[in-house]
Structures are given as structure tokens and as C-alpha cells.
Amino acid sequence: MTAAAGQLRRGLLMGGIMAASLAVTGTTLTNAAWTDNEYVHAHNVGTDGRCEQDSGTTTTASARQLSGTLLNSNLDSVAALHGLSVTNDGAGTSTASANAIRINPDTFMAPLDASALNTDLLQLSLPLGLPVGSADVYSQWGQTLNNGNTTAASGLITDSGGALGLGQTQNPDNPPVMATLNLGAVIPTALAGITLDVGAASSIAELTYCGDLGNGWQGPLPDPLVERSYQASALNLNADMPTLDAAAAGADTLLRDVNSKLQAAQPGLSAAVAQDLIAASTPLLGGLDSLTPADVETEVKLDLSQLDLTAAKVLLTSTMTDAQGLITVDFGSGVARINLAKAEGGINSLNGKAPNTKIALDQDITNQLSTALTQVLDTWRAKVITAVQQAIRATPASVTATVTVRSLGIPVGEIGLGLGPVTTGQLLDLHYGVPGTPVAPVTTSLKLLVLSPPITALDTLASGLAAALPFISGKALHNGLILGVVETLNTSLQEQTSPVGPALAKALEQVNALLSITVNVQPDQPGYPGTTKSTPLSVTALQISLDPITALDLSIATSSIAYTD
């Protein structure tokens, strides 16, 4: 192998996980990797020839996408999950396990076909068992070259025209889900309604037996070089929460009551307008000898149409995510989805971890999630309230008033006032003093009840009350609807959502006590959760188990290499 080819191979093996793009249905596959003729058939200046010879070393590449135990059953008993094993005898011959598909004399692939594995505990959701060369194949891949160089890869990979691609999906914000683990099926008392979505995961292990000697020449290395990498695209914890269901159901009931509360408020609104009309008449009575507000009677009717609350009701089945993307709440299904990858510190925070790193829901993360949930619930409640306010503002309002003026107890005239229909929002904005709000027109009529009425004074009173009526009506609507109906609704929604936070905190506490998640699992390195093993040299992208029981112990995307001189 040439120096250039060897460097290309190592660089792409280690960088392919981060750079190669492979996605599920609806996206485009990009094979950014190396090709067979580049790492098998290169003959350039810079090699002493020994890298083109049989190594005399037996090497094995093994790749397995799923292994472990489910419901106390070892997955070794499932033939479709046996993975791939390729061995080179060091004398020029590579052989592979029975399920392997040969790509070239030294390279094999075994697409995963686990359709029969779906259980109450584990549901696989990626397209599996597709032909070699198809996009989106979850597969196992191995290569053992005659010179001893060996590679194993497991994950969302494909081989098309000899080009291998594996690793991160094209849309890291919404990666594909490989499998869903129903944790509640194992421990229903503690983890009811809890599921774990595992995103596309890949791993790669490489043995460089023959490579750069450091002097510009390629040859057998004094000590074989082992490199291991992994990629995990997503890890989402889903909590089906009765408190969320109850909050959405309670909000629905509250919204159904809004129109009835609106109708019930109308007599009070009319009374408020009447009271303020009498108060507004005080400075206008100067032309009517010895009259006081007690001599002015009003009869007011304020009519509001039924509210269209469609926009508010849509929010009851909406999905919302906090600003950091830590938690997504589906109010329609009552499920809170926690992005454990981002909770660990960023979009790729499951990756680049030291060997045998545990992913834990510690107190800091729990506090982050609590803050994120509060943000989502507050945003949702604010959106519901805003939608109700907008519905109120859009509804038409009409006001009719009759003002009877008496002198010495004798009615001398009746002033009729008519406003609308105009939108409630226009009247509210007049009350709020919003610049540019057009004044709603008011019609007036005057009925004289005596032979010599004070016409000029009555006209002045009518004009003054007509000018004041839109502002008086806006004030009544604000006090009765915004401060009354809407604020009461807001308080009730707060009461509906208040149990959600403590319920999630309790669920996370249970999960943290029982669920163990480890990334970049390497049995020969410190911190390995099992018995330390020095051979084979392997890497597993994700290991998931439930402690202290053994009903679930799942390893995802394992690649390993072994060699004997």
C-alpha cells in the first residue's frame, strides 16, 4: 500500500463518521469515503514491497449492530442478528460468516434483517434488509487485507460501487430513529409510559498492521496501530404523562366555557357602561338648570357575538420545544420528549466522549430540563391566552343606550345612542390610547318630552355622551373581559399545568436510578461496565441496560478487530 493510499484510508476511516452523510427516507445519500481500488491495489513509490505481501498474521474483523439480552433472552439465539465476521489467514485467503455478501475477495457486508425481532420491548423502525448498494441500509461491514490491515464497521452504512459511507445523518436536528425501547414493558410500576428512542448509530475499528514507518516508506509497523471511533445521532427519552393529558383536557374544558362566561359577563358590561355614562354627563349639565347626575337615567345594552376560538383550540394538540431544544411537549398526545444528546451539552454531545462514558440524568441536567419544561408550559399558556384575546378583539360589539333627562322629576328628553357593530379590539385600543385608532362612529337621536324643552342643552349633552361612549365601552370591555374572563382563564391554566413539572421530575428520578447508558464502550479501557477484556479490540457506540435487573442489556453498533502473529 502506498503512503498516499494509507493516509487516505486512515483519514477517511477516522473522519468518515463525522463527515459521511447517510440518511433515511426522504433525504439524499452521499458516499463520502474511500474506494476499493484506493486501498487494495495501490502501487506507488514509497513502499518497500512488504505491504504487498501476505502478512503471516491471522486477522479478524467483526461487526454486529445489535447484541445483548432482551427480556432475559440472549440475542445470540436470533440468527438474523449474528452479525458479520471476516478472517484472513495471513496467507492470502479471507473467509466470512455464512450470512456475508462478498464485495471483493477481502471485503464483505451483511445487511441487518431484524424484522422478526420486534417485541413489546423493542421496536425497530429503520428500513432493514435492503439489497447491498441501496441507500439507508443498516448493515455490518468487514475487510481483512492480506497485509494484515483490518477494518470492521457497523451502522447505517452502504456500499455502492465499492464506496463505503457511514455515520452522521444529513439532518442532525432531526435524525432517524433506529429503535424504540419500551422501558415501561420491563418495569411498569416505576417506568410506566417511558420509552427511549435510539437514533442511527455507527462504529468503526481499524487495525493498521502495515503503514507509514515514519521515514516516508510503507511497511510493517513495529507495533500494530488500533484506531476506534463511534457515532450516535440521537437519544430521546419519551415520557407519556397523564398530567399533560389532564392539562390539555382541562384547557379544552376552560375554552368551551369562554363563550358562556362571555355571555354571562354582558349584563355587568352594560351596567358599567351605564354608570360611566352618568358620570360623563356631570360636566355636560351646565345648560340644564339645577340638574344633577341623579336626574339622568340610562338604559344600556352591550352585545357581543360568539367568539371563534379555533386558533386557541388548535394549540391544545400542538407540539412545542424550548429554545435550547432540550424538551419537546406534544400536548395532543401528552408526551414529553427529552433530547438526552442536547441535555449532555450540545447537538453532538453524545459523540467525542472518552471510552466508557456514562450518560446520566444528574441534578444539573434535571434542573436544565425543569427550566426548559417551565419555558414550554409558559409559552403554551401564553399562546392560548393570546389566541383567546385575539378572538375577543376580532368579535363584533354593539352598544345601544337611552339616556332620560328629568327636571323636577319630570322627563324632559330622551337621548338615544347607537354604537357599532365594531370590533371589540377597536374599542379596547381606544381605551388603551393606541395611536392611530379610528374613533368608532356613534349615532344619536333626541326625543323631546315637554312643550318647551332645553333643546340646546340636550343637544350638547347628546354630543358629549356620543363622543365618550366608545371610550367608555372600551374601558368596560377591558375590565370585564380582559381583566375578568381572560385573567381568570390564565389563572386556571396555570393551575392545570402546575402538576406537570413535579411529575416529570419524579419520572426522571426513576429513570436515572434504573437506566444505564454508556457511549464509546471499549472493554479493554478503564470504566468498562462489565468484565474487562483485552481481546478482541472493540468499540460499541451505545450500551443500554436496566439496573439491577438483566431484562435489558443492549449493545448497538459494535465493531471489533483481532490479530494473532
Question: Where in the sequence are the language-model features?
Answer:
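N-terminal secretory signal peptides that target proteins for export/translocation
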Residues: 1-5
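Extended, solvent-exposed, non-transmembrane regions
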Residues: 51-565
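Short, polar/proline-rich extracytoplasmic segments that appear immediately after membrane translocation
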Residues: 6-59
